[in-house]
């Protein structure tokens, strides 16, 4: 019992130091991670781009618990290295797919949204694979639904993988809403799913 608790504490320490978002960058995002267990497969990473914009990744690994969370370590490291180089979103998607193919067992993958907001705050470049639809909500409440067009990361080999990204124009006051399937699986007091 004590050994398991100690091992969990060690792993939690490693995760808390490996997946760190800069406070200055986090001010541009409202985010909430509420794992059902101590460890889970949901990940949110945001980094500045060399051109003055912002990169972000919202990911959801298959499974639950520590086994699903472990994939976040190579993804975080690769994301940090590639965003520091200013790679395009499509290149990020391709490289993260390759990282996951190398590191994960064949039955694991990561649904993900990878995005870059341009320095002007207007250009939004997105790659979506295996995630629930995103919502682009205008200042006056109009909602544009953005559906994933690709398979999740870590499934297809490079020659089959589609890294095409979409570029959208955002207006002042627009909000981008992204969530994992965990939100749709939340239940009310009657055990009815809300999603």
Task: Walk through the language-model features, giving the residues of each.
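Short, intrinsically disordered, charge-balanced linker/junction segments flanking boundaries
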Residues: 190-195
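Short acidic/polar inter-strand loop motif in beta-rich domains
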Residues: 185-186
């Amino acid at each position: 019992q004590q050994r398991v608790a100690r091992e969990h504490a060690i792993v939690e320490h490693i995760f808390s130091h490996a997946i760190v978002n800069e406070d200055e960058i986090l001010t541009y995002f409202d985010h909430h991670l509420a794992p059902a267990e101590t460890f889970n497969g949901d990940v949110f990473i945001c980094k500045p781009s060399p051109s003055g914009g912002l990169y972000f990744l919202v990911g959801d690994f298959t499974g639950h618990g520590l086994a699903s969370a472990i994939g976040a370590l190579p993804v975080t490291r690769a994301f940090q290295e590639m965003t520091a180089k200013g790679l395009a979103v499509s290149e990020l998607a391709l490289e993260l797919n390759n990282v996951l193919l190398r590191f994960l067992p064949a039955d694991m993958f990561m649904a993900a949204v990878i995005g870059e907001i341009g320095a002007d705050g207007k250009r939004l470049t997105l790659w979506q694979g295996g995630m629930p639809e995103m919502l682009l909500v205008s200042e006056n409440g109009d909602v544009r639904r953005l559906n994933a067009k690709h398979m999740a990361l870590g499934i297809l080999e490079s020659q089959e993988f589609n890294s095409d990204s979409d570029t959208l124009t955002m207006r002042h006051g627009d909000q981008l809403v992204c969530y994992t399937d965990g939100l749709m699986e939340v239940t009310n007091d009657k055990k009815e799913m809300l999603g």
